Amino acid sequence: SQPSMRLRF
């Protein structure tokens, strides 16, 4: 399980 990372540009 990978941590969900949301990158906002």
From Swiss-Prot:
UniProtKB keywords: Amidation, Neuropeptide, Secreted
* CC per GO annotation: extracellular region
Taxonomic superkingdom = Eukaryota
* Compartments where located: Secreted
> Which GO biological process categories is it annotated with?
neuropeptide signaling pathway
Keyword Secreted in the entry? The reply is yes
Chain positions found as Phenylalanine amide: F9
Name the coiled-coil region(s).
Answer: none
The similarity comment for this entry is:
Belongs to the FARP (FMRFamide related peptide) family.
Name it: FMRFamide-like neuropeptide FLP4
